[in-house]
Amino acid sequence: MSVNPHTVPFENTPGVRATDDISRHLADLRYPLHLSFKILALASQATVTDATGKTVIYTKQKMFKFREHVEIFTDKSKATQLADINASKVIDWSARYNSTDASGQPIGSVGRKGWRSIWRAHYETFNPGDDIPDFSIREENPGSKVMDSLLGGIPILGMATGYLFHPKYLATRTSGQAVMRLTKVAAFWEGRFKVEKIGELSPREELNLILSFLMLVMLERKRG
């Protein structure tokens, strides 16, 4: 039986290129992670830090493009690129967002689950080489997201929504096993989220889900 090398422990997959780079980058990661967006920035900028304050990911999305393109760096210096995310087609509801590492090797992809995502966020994440989703990301408390979106656009009042409503998103395997959760946390002037790892993941799966959560937050912000 063939085995997808991206879903098993990395010490058992010596043939996967660039795997060691990702494994080393995530080796000393301490959860929970903290994802922050600069709401007032002209471009979409996001930073992911771990529990020790170490920067894990920094991105500044390219603006005014017909097709989504997000460059992922290891820190704000942008000296080392960790990954690249590109939309499979011109921006629409069915677009898939494909992640590759610095050498061009696939990390995985994420996309909205059809029309269900209009009312309740539902995304699917795929490991490289898989045609069926390996993970499902669902909004756990959609009412909170609706109120956060409705009030977030109201001057002054919108500043307080970060303290009142905390949308949560849970990533599960097809078996139903929960592996990672994203929760919006209280903050003024920026969007802040907490990422908790609650299940076993290979390093590439782990990065795939972190990037999937990153894209989810960016896309949900645009959706309102």
Model-assigned labels for residue ranges:
Residues 2-224:
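Intrinsically disordered, low-complexity proline/glycine-rich segments
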